[in-house]
Amino acid sequence: MTLESYAGDVHTVPQSENSMEERGGGELFVPPLNFAMVDNGIFRSGFPEPVSFSFLQSLRLKSIIYLCPEAYPEVNREFAKSNGIQVFQFGIERCKEPFVNIPDEVIREALQVLLDTENHPVLIHCKSGKHRTGCLVGCVRKIQRWCLSSIFDEYQRFAAAKARISDQRFMELFDISNLKHTPLSFSCSKRYTNTIDY
């Protein structure tokens, strides 16, 4: 089985036994843990291991948003450098405590990078691709005017049994009023609107 993602929806697709083996030049394409497409040019995942580098190359990434405070491993830095990928690090501490707040200002800085289409295609990741990544994606969804129940559903699809009330509260209370409200050029609704002739 493999997972295909379309704007946050995860679908299971049956595969033949050999379908993960050779693609094109005989390389193995293995997506990182919790990989999904958020929107056109925006992807999310857990920490990319070297086995996923060929897959990531196929995305032709321009940028990576890394949401952990730990130094980026040398092998990942070399991969980014050799592929012309700029890495933006926003160190958000891993937190399991229920009343510890996610740093609002760090999420805002990460959003500025994420919303700049010059940085697309971009991969957002933390260690597991659940909590920190889920909060940043949830804030993007608020900007895209998703309702809270849909934002929480998407968050819970990735966090599963480890969903945190504190993360959901952060997304609910995150104030988007002072963010630049230009149409998001990567959003599906804008893309379809531009193709209609009146």
Swiss-Prot record:
1D-myo-inositol hexakisphosphate binds at N101, I102. Keywords: Hydrolase, Plant defense. GO terms for biological process: defense response; regulation of defense response to bacterium. One of its GO terms (molecular function) is inositol-3,5-bisdiphosphate-2,3,4,6-tetrakisphosphate 5-diphosphatase activity. It holds the Pfam family Y_phosphatase2. It comes from the Eukaryota. Residues 90-102 are annotated as: WPD loop important for active site topology. Highly expressed in flowers and at lower levels in roots, leaves, stems and siliques. SUPFAM superfamilies: (Phosphotyrosine protein) phosphatases II (SSF52799). Its EC number is 3.6.1.52. InterPro entries: PFA-DSPs (IPR020428), Prot-tyrosine_phosphatase-like (IPR029021), Siw14-like (IPR004861), Tyr_Pase_AS (IPR016130), Tyr_Pase_dom (IPR000387), TYR_PHOSPHATASE_DUAL_dom (IPR020422). The record marks R132 as: Transition state stabilizer. It catalyses: 5-diphospho-1D-myo-inositol 1,2,3,4,6-pentakisphosphate + H2O = 1D-myo-inositol hexakisphosphate + phosphate + H(+); 1,5-bis(diphospho)-1D-myo-inositol 2,3,4,6-tetrakisphosphate + H2O = 1-diphospho-1D-myo-inositol 2,3,4,5,6-pentakisphosphate + phosphate + 2 H(+); 3,5-bis(diphospho)-1D-myo-inositol 1,2,4,6-tetrakisphosphate + H2O = 3-diphospho-1D-myo-inositol 1,2,4,5,6-pentakisphosphate + phosphate + 2 H(+); 6-diphospho-1D-myo-inositol pentakisphosphate + H2O = 1D-myo-inositol hexakisphosphate + phosphate + H(+). Residues 34-188 form the Tyrosine-protein phosphatase domain. Plants overexpressing DSP4 exhibit increased sensitivity to infection by the bacterial pathogen Pseudomonas syringae pv tomato strain DC3000. Belongs to the protein-tyrosine phosphatase family. Atypical dual-specificity phosphatase Siw14-like subfamily. PANTHER family: TYROSINE-PROTEIN PHOSPHATASE, TYROSINE-PROTEIN PHOSPHATASE DSP4-RELATED. Cleaves the beta-phosphate at the 5-position of soluble inositol pyrophosphates. Has highest activity on 5-diphosphoinositol 1,2,3,4,6-pentakisphosphate (5-InsP(7)), 1,5-bis-diphosphoinositol 2,3,4,6-tetrakisphosphate (1,5-InsP(8)) and 3,5-InsP(8). Acts as a negative regulator of defense responses against the bacterial pathogen Pseudomonas syringae pv tomato strain DC3000. This is Inositol diphosphatase DSP4. It comes from Arabidopsis thaliana (Mouse-ear cress). The gene is DSP4.
